[in-house]
Swiss-Prot record:
The keyword Metal-binding does not apply. It is found in: Cytoplasm. This is Serine hydroxymethyltransferase. It catalyses: (6R)-5,10-methylene-5,6,7,8-tetrahydrofolate + glycine + H2O = (6S)-5,6,7,8-tetrahydrofolate + L-serine. Keywords: Amino-acid biosynthesis, Cytoplasm, One-carbon metabolism, Pyridoxal phosphate, Transferase. Gene3D superfamilies: Aspartate Aminotransferase, domain 1 (3.90.1150.10), Type I PLP-dependent aspartate aminotransferase-like (Major domain) (3.40.640.10). CDD domains: SHMT. The modification N6-(pyridoxal phosphate)lysine is found at K226. (6S)-5,6,7,8-tetrahydrofolate binds at L117, G121, H122, L123. One of its GO terms (biological process) is glycine biosynthetic process from serine. It comes from Rhodopirellula baltica (strain DSM 10527 / NCIMB 13988 / SH1). Its EC number is 2.1.2.1. NCBIfam families: PRK00011.1.
Length: 420
């Protein structure tokens, strides 16, 4: 019997229900994935008991000799994986990583260029309610009105006009590969530093499917889950000359003690991402996304930018007379989990936008391929085009339950928290 089951039945029941949801359905939120059993074991290890404020060899607590080894391994592996000069593995999240970089190179009120949240950016790229938009003068760039790809004519114009101290590249809902070299050219022209937030596509960079921002950017931030398949956490990489300020603005600037059990999980994640198996995985993620996108297009759905280069796509569900909120609910009834999402130049409200965001990282981790993507694409179209047909939705849900039996969720069977 699990310790959780015997000690806290209410939490146990919730974990069991979530396990069933993950196993019986299709997880297609682009930012979600499954970690390996080794990473889950590390995150649940005895390292969670240890406080370790400071950095390896320079701690404010005793007894850190073993966690120093863990953190040093994580740093070295991050640098090797991405070819970075320096790395900080302590950020608790991607947002914390971004905040630390901002503190390292900006003063309150400084001007920054970042992608508009409504056109694919992230909250930390200048959203007015976020700390980034409250502390700094963010000027937003966007995408072209016709092809929905980054509008570099606009980016150049804004950079020349506003002379930002920092340019932020990266996105949370942009289905195309980002040309980091182009951003570097613009940053150099106007004398700005360049930060790339590759949280969504870091795994594709690690697998050498997408171009790396590391040679071009002063700072690179990322989460370690999503396409990297690690624990939920963050990472900063930078030029060696920036490391001292980055370290200072992670600790003590924005955080206290690091989560050493999560740092261990990150170290394992970085090692996994250097394997040949992982390179195949990265390619499969992109191949699956393109197959799914092609299927949806052939059914008559509209995709932002006409398709995808990476792990995600944005579907304009107004083509089937739906809003994103109902589309999300309809697919959820079928056992397909996605999220409603704004699309470029959206005329609807953020809480009921025109689109949904769909991703393939989690399903690819489960071992699904092109044949499954074609079936899933057809299910998505059938459900959305007959959105009030509860019987159809239940039928799709049954078919999905049957299909996924051949694709178990990694780590679920090994975790004591999911075994009665």
């Amino acid at each position: 019997m699990s310790f959780i089951q015997s000690q806290d039945p209410a939490i146990w029941d919730a974990i069991q229900a979530e396990t069933t949801r993950q196993q019986d359905g299709l997880e297609m939120i682009a930012s979600e994935n499954y970690t390996s059993p080794a990473i889950m074991e590390a995150v649940g290890s005895i390292l969670t008991n240890k406080y370790a404020e400071g950095y390896p060899g320079r701690r404010y607590y005793g007894g850190c000799e073993h966690v120093d080894v863990v953190e040093t391994i994580a740093i070295d592996r991050a640098k090797e994986l991405f070819g970075a000069e320096a790395a900080n593995v302590q950020p608790h999240s991607g947002s914390q990583a971004n905040a630390a970089v901002y503190l390292s190179c900006l003063e309150v009120g400084d001007t920054v260029l970042g992608l508009d949240l409504a056109q694919g950016g992230h909250l930390t790229h200048g959203m007015k309610l976020n700390m980034s938009g409250r502390l700094y003068n963010f000027v937003n760039y966007g995408v072209d009105k016709v092809n929905h790809r980054l509008d570099f004519d606009q980016i150049v114009k804004l950079a020349r006009e506003h002379k930002p101290k920092l340019i932020v590249a990266g996105a949370s809902a942009y289905p195309r590969e980002i040309p980091h070299d182009r951003f570097k050219e613009i940053a150099d022209e106007v004398g700005a530093k360049l930060m790339v937030d590759m949280a969504h596509y870091a795994g594709l960079v690690a697998a050498k499917i997408h171009n790396s921002p590391v040679p071009y950017a002063d700072y690179v931030t990322t989460t370690t889950h999503k396409t990297l398949r690690g624990p939920r956490s963050g990472l900063i990489m930078c030029k060696e000359e920036h490391l001292k300020l980055v370290n200072r603005n992670v600790f003590p600037g924005t955080q206290g003690g690091p989560l050493m059990h999560v740092v261990a999980g990150k170290a394992i994640c970085f090692a996994e991402a250097m394997t040949e198996e992982y390179a195949h995985y990265g390619q499969a993620v992109v191949d699956n996304a393109k197959t799914l996108a092609d299927t949806l297009l052939s059914c008559g759905l509209r995709l932002v930018s006409g398709g995808t280069d990476n792990h995600l796509m944005l579907v304009d569900v107004t083509a089937v007379d739906l809003g994103g909120k109902k589309a999300e609910a309809v697919l959820d009834a079928c056992g397909i989990t996605v999220n409603m999402n704004m699309i470029p130049f959206d005329q609807r409200k953020p809480m009921d936008p025109s689109g949904i965001r769909i991703g393939t990282p989690a399903l690819t981790t489960r071992g699904m391929g092109g044949d499954e993507m074609k079936r899933i694409g057809q299910w998505i179209y059938n459900a959305l085009s007959d959105s009030d047909n509860a019987a159809l939705h239940e039928s799709i849900r049954t078919e999905i339950r049957e299909m996924v039996q051949a694709f178990p969720v990694p780590a679920a069977a090994e975790s004591p928290a999911t075994v009665a």
